Structures are given as structure tokens and as C-alpha cells.
């Protein structure tokens, strides 16, 4: 046993739990089990600034307890550790070990500090988003709404699949570049035609991969931000989609690809698609020339990750800024005025902080708009290009695509971590994120950039059913990738972008998604609740969500054998709720690869109790 005792997840030692709003203080306590103590202090460091020590005062009634306050005035990423000075002896230090616990050392260089996230503000999210169940659609691969399946706006030098059962593939040239793009012919009218299906499934909002004019099937190579891609339909089709969604109390967010454009776009126009003498690659006097950084004109230029099909745009250029988010005539203003309910920003870590804030300011001129960013890591400590990103500060993104949570689900269900570590990993993310930011993250089990969840879980339908249960019970907004509920398999791109198997769906998985979508709408704790963990003998994991007067418990047996609910351990769960759970579930026997969901009738949960 060490001589310094601390647990950041217990209110006995740290109040409040988790992230802190700037301008507030953290009450911090440690217990010190050693003699000749001359000083106890907590050292706090903001990124790239000097450490400030705050003395802790010995408690009059409990001599081993030392308490003080950390004063936080500005938002940012902070780290802290404890120092105990002793008479005629080396100082002791306590840094982070795992979970909320610390590790003691006499060597300051070996201290791994605890993280403290501080944010400026939390803005209440729109009510529709709070209640949302999202569905992500890759438009070319979902549905064709034309009467006889005819394909609109066929592009030159492309190929069309003979049937929607064909597996997607890329055709490369001798330089391993895409020689011609492949299409199935899905369109906006197809999405409109399938709205009844989506509504029956329990979907209340759509996230569409890019729909603007482009050369590729994924359309992340935008050619014209102000036009719908002709293969997907017309602007009138888009307006009809928005109208039909809103009439059905459903909402829509679009994919904003503002870091780069297509090489053949009207802005760059390397292939003369928009005329021989227009665009930055053909005319140095073009109004778009200053948008790009040419190293050797016109063939060498900055592009996204070295992909010359995707010239990078200079986000600091005033003309480009006004084009994207200006108040009048901008890309955002046009589509927001047509009824878009929010945006998902592609490669958000490539967009400067000020650029993100101005996008947010544009959206804030409208009621109930949402802004989500593509960030693959823990957004509270994300660093890109040597700069820590203030995603969680409250003035740019509402939330991010929660890839860390996806990885958590996969590691749990593939048995890559024991249940104690799984619980600690989840609560670490909960601790690091401001509460609203955590609840606003768009959770997924797969996207167009990942392998399909059925493939990742080795074609195990029972495990995918558990994954869906977790998706709808974890903090955040659930988002189903098109076809996952139908049992679509798929490895890496392009295999993860197969056409939806209409008429050949997995009814068991569809029923599972429908069930959990209904449960989420009924349970307030799943939308607003705190998050706790229960471990039963390292056999069963319990995911607990609770508010002041309601709670739910999801029990998960990930093993291919029966499991007993016994030897309960809790993490970040109020004592009164622990007692209610023990009475309800102790002794239960769970079948292999199953879940059990319970609503707990607790009159009042004291969320500020210790655990």
C-alpha cells in the first residue's frame, strides 16, 4: 500500500467529478499515511505553462486528510499531481495510474499527471437532437427511387454495376490511382422512398455523406458546393427530402467537406471540366487562385495527405472564408436556408480553430442547428499539427463522431480487455468530456471509413445484437450506419460500402435496432443520465445510466457460456443506487451472448453521494 491515497472518481477526494467550467474551483483532498509531513500540495499545469502549487490544509478531525481548492479561471487542458514534503526525507509524488487511482513515486520525472478538462460554456442542445436516433446513408449505395431504377446524371469515364448484389471494387491504373469511378445509382428520391422504412425502424434523423456535385462516388472531392450532384438528383429533390423529413418529425445533417476540393472542381479545374481557361490550375488571375498553395504551378500543390485528387484549400483566405460561412450567399447559408438541421465536418482536425468558430457562428444564427466534427481520438486532448484543439470548450463543436466509444465496444466484445479495464476506459472518457459534449457526441458502430461491425465481430449476430444494445445505452447520440441493421458485411473501403440488400435483410438485427430505438425514446436516463459501471465477478458488465430520479441497468454477458451475477463492484455509482441494483440483480444467471435491460424504481438517487 502507498502512503498517499486518492481517487479522482470519488467525491470524497475530488468535487466535482469530471470536467470543470472555467471560473469554478475544484475541491481536492488526499489522505496521507506517513509521519513528519511538512507540506501537502497539488501541482496544476496548463498546457505549455508553469506549474502552480496549491497548498492543502490538514483536517482538524481527520489528521490524515488534507484538503484545498484548485482555482481555474480559463478554459483549456490542465494536468495535476500531488506532492508531499516530509522532514528529513525525500518528497513523495502521486500521479495517475489507472481509472481514478494514483501511483506513488519519489521521482518527479516518473509522475504521470491526472487530466482536468476545463471548458468555457455548455450550450443546451436542440430538443430534436437530444431525442435523436441517427441513420448514416452513403447515398450511392442506399436506394434508387426512380420508377424503373434508371440512373440519373451518368458521368463520363465511369462504370455502373450490373446488379446491386455486385461487390464494390476499385479499378486502378498503372500508377495505382483510380482509373474510373464505380456507381450503383442510389439517389435522393431513393431516400425519400425509404423514409417509411426508416421511421418504422425508429430513426428520427439522417446523416448523409456528401451530396454536392463531385467526380467520385463518395463525393469528398467536391466540384461545386452549391449544386446537388446530378446522379443524386436535383435541388428540387433535395427540397422534397427536407420537406418530407420535417413533416415526419425527422431531421437532416449534411457532410461539410471544407478542407479540400476536387482536382476537377470549378475552383481548381485541372481537368478543364468547367472550361479551358477557368479555375486556379488554369488561370493565375482566377478569383480562386489564392485559395490554393502551389509549389510548382500548376502541377505541384498542397493536397490532403498527398492525394493529388484533393487539393487543400487555404482556410485563412478571406475570400474562401466568406464563401463557406459568410452571412450572405455562402455555402452554409444557402443550405441552412433550405432547411438543413446541422453539419458533420469532415477532417475537423484540418480546420483551424477560428474557422470552426465561424462555422458555429453561422449556424447559431438559426434555431436548433447542430455541429459535429470528425475526430478519431479523445477530443479533450486532441493535438493536430502541434496545436491542442479546443473542441470541448463550448464555442465550436457540439460533439464529435465518437470513434473512441466504437473501439471500446469492439474491444469489449472481442475480449481484448478484461471488464475492470473496460469500465475504467469508458469512465475515463466520461471524466474527460464536459457532460453536454459527451451527450452530444455521435456514437457509431461503423461508418464509411471503418469495417462493418458484423465483420469486425467475426460474423457473430449475437455479438452484434449486444453491440446495438450498448450503442443505445451508452452516453451520446446513437447513429446506425446504413445496412448494419440488415446484416451487411464488409471489410475495408470499398467493401464497407456495399449496396443495401433490399429484400434480403437480417430481420433479427432489424428487430433489435427497432427495440432499442423505442427504449431510448422512453427512458430519460438514456438521454440525460450520468454513467456508471458495475462488474460482476469479471463475467458480467453492467452499464448504468442515472438521473436524480430514474435509472437503467444494461447487463452484458459477452461470453459463450452462462454467467452468474455475483461479487458486484461499482464505479461512479451512488451508494443508494448500488443498493437498489444489488437487490434487483444479485444471483441472476445469464445465458451466453445475452443482455438484460432493467429500469430501476428509485425514488431519489443522490447523485452527489460518494461511491
List the model feature ranges, each with a label:
Residues 138-204, 211-338, 359-365, 381-382, ...:
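Substrate-binding/active-site clefts of carbohydrate-active enzymes
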Residues 133-135, 206-208, 252-254, 343, ...:
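Hydrophobic faces of well-ordered beta-strands that scaffold small-molecule active sites
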Residues 30, 137, 198, 208, ...:
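Conserved, mostly hydrophobic/aromatic
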Residues 1-130, 204:
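Glycan-association/targeting regions that enable binding to alpha-glucans and other polysaccharides
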Residues 32-34, 79, 133, 584-611:
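C-terminal beta-strand-rich structural cap/linker in extracellular carbohydrate-active enzymes
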Residues 27, 534-571:
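Carbohydrate-binding surface patches
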Residues 427-526, 563:
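Active-site-proximal substrate-binding groove within the catalytic cores of carbohydrate-active enzymes
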Residues 242-251, 260, 265-276, 331-333, ...:
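Active-site-proximal helices and loops of the catalytic beta/alpha 8
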